[in-house]
Amino acid sequence: NYEGMMAAGHYKLDNLCATVDLNRLQISGTTGQVMDSASLAEKFRDFGWNVIEVLDGNDCAQLVNAYEQAAAYKGKPTAVIASTVKGKGVSFMENQISWHHGVMTEEQYEQAVKELKEALQ
């Protein structure tokens, strides 16, 4: 919440790192339609935070790099804002609003695990 963001910036809590999963989907639509999140980085900066924006939050190497930068940054808390694709790597889930709150069937679970294992090979 904003009070927490303000307090962390005010007290220069440089051992604090917040991660925002910016997949642009929420239960009732896209964030652009329902509640725009375009200015999140600005809001964090306005409250005294260091901000690291990750272009592909589904790329583990980019996330590791961001967290290494956050750990090295002194004097401010850090917000890592990672642009992601909800359900990345699972064909029937990828970028689908319905999976913000969906429950898989056993068959869907097996298919998802299969696709993710194949992607790791």
Predicted regions span which residues?
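Glycine-rich ThDP/TPP pyrophosphate-binding loop and its adjacent helix/strand module
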Residues: 1-121
